[in-house]
Amino acid sequence: MTQMSVPFDEAARTIGRRCLCLRVQRASRAIGRQFDDAFRTIGLNNWQFSLLMNLNRPSPLTVTRLAEELAMDRTTTTKNLKPLERRGLVEIRRDDQDARVKRVILTEAGRALLTEAVQHWTVAQQKIEASLRGSDLASLHTALEAITQS
């Protein structure tokens, strides 16, 4: 086993400054907290908002497809859907052609809450974008998309 040629403290500082994983995780948590705060008054969190937004389409998604859209595993997606289902915001039904497949449907109550949530999202999004003044948001979006697609 070889020893590190860089002292640990120096390596830790370098990683702290340069590690994309660490920096993106920190930024994600900070942004997530801001959206959680924005949605709190309507009883949602940012993950639930993301689920509802992804279900707002003409045809219901399968649980597997929803998980893929959110870059989550199927089990975590199912777990995160349960509170929304209990609140009557989504329905999970067996597919008509294949009983092994489950489809997720946004209910009218879910659609109504989502409409309200979009207003809260808009305020939070504008606040976050304002905090990034001077940054090139288009480049940030492009870089994040490139990371997501790699």
Language model region names:
Residues 1-16, 130, 134-150:
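C-terminal regulatory/oligomerization modules of transcriptional regulators
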Residues 4-10, 20-23, 34-36, 53, ...:
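Short hydrophobic/aromatic-rich motifs at helix boundaries and adjacent loops
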Residues 8-19, 108, 112, 124:
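Short coil/turn segments at secondary-structure junctions
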Residues 12, 16, 68, 94-96:
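Short secondary-structure boundary/capping segments
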Residues 15, 22-25, 29-76, 82, ...:
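N-terminal helix-turn-helix DNA-binding core of bacterial DNA-binding proteins
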Residues 16-23, 27-34, 109, 120, ...:
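C-terminal ligand-sensing/allosteric alpha-helical core of TetR-family HTH transcriptional regulators
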Residues 32, 60, 82-142:
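Charged, amphipathic alpha-helical coiled-coil/dimerization segments
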Residues 37, 53-54, 112, 130, ...:
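Surface-exposed charged/polar residues within alpha-helices that form helix-capping/stabilizing sites
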